[in-house]
Amino acid sequence: MSVHRSKSSWAQAYLIHKRHRKSGLSSPLYQRILYGISIAVIVLILSGCTTIQGAVDDSPSFEEGGKLRITATTGMIADAAREVGGEHVTVTGLMGPGVDPHMYKASQGDIRKLDDADLVLYNGLHLEGSMTKIMEKMSKSRHVVAVAENIDPTQLRYSEDGATEYDPHIWFDVSLWMNVTQTIEAALIEADPAHEADYRQNATQYLAALNTLHQEVQTKIASIPESGRVLITAHDAFGYYGDAYNIEVKGLQGISTAAEYGSKDVSDLRNELVERGIKAVFVESSVPSRSMEAIIAGARSMGHTVQIGGELFSDAMGEAGTEEGTYIGMVRHNTDTIVEALK
């Protein structure tokens, strides 16, 4: 029974009642009989509509073709979801190249994309700033997963600026991103168990590629002389990278770009550059470069030349279709840029 037919039944019942009234069949006995019949018809109509509505609510809300619709906050998460999901998923990323997730505010369009998804993936650990409350609210009624949720807290770095409890930039340690990949794998299987075998196979292949990348980064960073193995960026996003690959990391701002910095922070970092003879600093694709330019100018005024070693991708990946537009390509680009500037 369709909703249209239900509405027609309502109309037919009304017309029958009206016709009989015109025919003079309006005795109390007749009215009681007609009332009983009307109630029975209404119950049948409502029960039919309820059954239909229940069937719609309980069925998978996949798009035509049976693909699982996934909305992910960051490009890194979206890329991992595509790798694991393969041909069975359609992935929409909210934050594109150059977007700072710490300062990001969801638009009405973003809310629609989240609402239309069968599965929502976000980083967690307060990376997404004000969007965190939206995710927590949606998780009460939808399939929403924080991909960092299964990482052992002992492997997480504490936030030194007090903005969050933990440093959310987990993707800079490839071994932690392997954990995230497994969480995404489990989320896809739960949402779409019919394709479990394919999700497991895709995840196994991607995890093997990530393991190779992890070893590659270790080898390349080790080629930098230890005295010059210092990575200086606009904000402290590379802490996990430093811990995992044995390179000292310093950022002008704290873990979140929402953290403010002052003239003393600039002068302190400038003085350290000069005293240690550090020859390169790095700008980030998602953070304005003026802070690094101020430090370079300050060092130059003290007779020390510091170069911009290149642009690193920190909180967002590169353009779609480029090597840096994938997680593996982004990590490889960052590593090669760092090694070339500091070696």
For the regions a language model picked out, list residue spans one by one.
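Bacterial N-terminal signal peptides that target proteins for export
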Residues: 6-10, 14-37
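N-terminal acidic, proline/glycine-rich, low-complexity intrinsically disordered segments
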Residues: 1-5
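Extracytoplasmic metal-acquisition and chelation regions
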Residues: 15-18, 35-38, 49-343
